Amino acid sequence: FSGAPEEFDAKSALLREHTIAVGTDFDAIVRSSNYNTVIGATEAEVADRIDAIEARVAPFLGKRTEGFMREYRSGTALCVGTPEQVVERLSDMKARGLGYAINYFPEAAYDRSGMDLFAREVIPALS
C-alpha cells in the first residue's frame, strides 16, 4: 500500500471491494505501508540529517540527487520530522486502518540515533 493517506484510502476501498467479491473478511487483512524515515528531536535536526543524507548520496547519484531527495524535502513525507509530527501522522494512518509501518532509515549505516529516537518516542506513543 502507498504511504500517502489518500492513496491508502483508495487502495483500501478497492481491497474492500475485492474481498466482498470473493467472500473474504476485509478486517482479517493486515494493511501495511513502507516509509522512508528521518527523525530528529527538532526540525533543525531533521534538516541537518536530510542534508547529511544528500551529501552521502550526491557523489553517486549526480544529477539524480534532487529527484532522490525530493520526498525527504517535500513536507508531505509522513515519517520525516520530529517525533511529535511522526506520531501525529502515523496515528492518522492507524485510524485509516494501517496495521503496521515498514520503516526504512536511510542513515542507519552511519548513525543509529534516529532509529533510537523512533524506538524511544514514536513506537510507545503508537502502541
Predicted regions located by residue number:
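Active-site-adjacent structural elements that line small-molecule/cofactor binding pockets in enzymes
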Residues: 1-127
